[in-house]
Amino acid sequence: MATTAGEQANYLQSADSMSDGRQHHPEEAGEKKQEEQKKSWGEWLQDLKIFIWNPEKKEVLGRDKKSWALILLFYFILYCFLAGLFALCIYGLLATISPYVPTYRDRVFPPGLTIRPQFNALYFSFNPSDRSTWSSHAESLNTFLEDYNDEIQQEKNLECTPGKYFFQPGEDHEERKACQFRRSLLKNCSGIEDPTFGFAQGKPCILLKMNRIVGYQAGSGIPIYVTCEILKADASYLGPVNFYPSDKFDLMYYPYYGKLTHVNYTSPLIAMQFTEVKNNQDINIQCKINGKDIISDHDKDRFLGRVAFTLHIG
């Protein structure tokens, strides 16, 4: 029994000491924390300097030269591999794509229409007696038609046979010839005899152009023609429309072989001159192309095969 009592006493004493030890640990942690908080800015700065460059261990940012050499070598190899993989993918992609002919053309829509001059929100308003309201449009048309000057066309392009396609077989990379479209063909809307393009007389000219599509055979053998109509108003407000050189896009300007090979190609134009538009009225006009395989009533694309604009002559 005595021995047992002694063992119990020793056990209680050791338990007390362990309890005292556990009670002292939080105090020691708190003291360490206070010591860290008591560090001055100078000490923090010194620690930072040591971290950046440790002269004793010869370390930069915690790494010696061997460690830095290994990690830089690793990233060099990694990025070289990624760059090579990227270059291989680009090469494979470019090897399957021709720069001359689009790869997929089975879902290409018929061409859209654009007009010149370009004006904001397709609302064209001017006063014939006020030059400032239309001079910029006349200048825009003159600049646009510079490539169509007769001298340039006769020097660079061929005089082709009207009414038939101008096929030019050969390799995709071979340069193709282009047919002449001389500026003088636009007559009253050429800007040659009348540099105001009819604006000064209240008889404005507007140019119509089809978008280019590589390989497209316009009209499937029958020339595409243009019609214009007034929307939501009396047809007499629009009056007659004169078309130059005609209301048709001649087949000899098709097919188009692409920008890289058809270098001197100039898109055929149709000039529309509105000679008897009712003044001081907003005239909503829609012009569209008509022909085989032409879509001009697409609900989601108002420029597919047609173009609508508002004309107001003050």
UniProtKB/Swiss-Prot annotation:
Localization in the cell: Membrane
Tissue expression pattern: Expressed in skeletal muscle, liver, lung, kidney, heart, brain and skin.
Note: Its function as a Na,K-ATPase beta-subunit will be lost in placental mammals.
Segments passing through the bilayer: 70-90
Disulfides per UniProt: 160-179, 189-205, 228-287
Organism: Xenopus laevis (African clawed frog)
Annotated segments matching region Disordered: 1-37
Biased composition (Polar residues): 1-17
Top-rank taxon: Eukaryota
Residues that carry a glycan: 188, 264
GO annotation terms (biological process): potassium ion transport; proton transmembrane transport; regulation of DNA-templated transcription; sodium ion transport
Membrane-protein topology: Single-pass type II membrane protein
Described function: This is the non-catalytic component of the active enzyme, which catalyzes the hydrolysis of ATP coupled with the exchange of Na(+) and K(+) ions across the plasma membrane.
Pfam families found in the cross-reference section: Na_K-ATPase (PF00287)
CC per GO annotation: nuclear inner membrane; sodium:potassium-exchanging ATPase complex
Subunit structure: Composed of two subunits: alpha (catalytic) and beta (accessory).
Ranges facing Cytoplasmic side: 1-69
Membrane topology, Extracellular segments: 91-314
InterPro entries: Na/K_ATPase_sub_beta (IPR000402), Na/K_ATPase_sub_beta_sf (IPR038702)
Modification after translation, per record: Glycosylated.
Biased composition (Basic and acidic residues): 19-37
Keywords, sorted A to Z: Disulfide bond, Glycoprotein, Hydrogen ion transport, Ion transport, Membrane, Signal-anchor, Transmembrane, Transmembrane helix, Transport
Similarity comment: family membership: Belongs to the X(+)/potassium ATPases subunit beta family.
Protein name (database record): Protein ATP1B4
